[in-house]
């Protein structure tokens, strides 16, 4: 499950123009087109960071429905929409802490879309297996 997520993460590091060109050139099924549209939409203006982001609101933005979009996440990542967004946010936090260990963790959690400290810490521990402080101690 995490392998699929990290493979997707690597693909997302491709600049938008190259990704859009690759998508346009490749023959795709309607499921592939939806998935490509989902990934581009999440990256556009960093929608994945929005605290208001929900499967329902995101599906509406795509002019689709929550079941179809949710199924696309399961099919392509073996994760639910919420799990994918959680991993994406925590992965951003981890990478930022590795490069800037002195950053204010509360501001960083807020930046990636967490309103509640307890939710951010719980999700960080769930994804990484350690608290943010334990993580910082390991990388220092």
What are these regions (language model features)?
Residues 5-110, 123-126, 130-140:
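Membrane-proximal linker segments that couple transmembrane helices to downstream signaling/catalytic modules
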Residues 66, 116-118:
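The DNA-contacting recognition helix of HTH DNA-binding domains
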Residues 113:
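ABC-family nucleotide-binding domains
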Residues 1-3:
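Hydrophobic cores of alpha-helical transmembrane segments in multi-pass inner/ER membrane proteins
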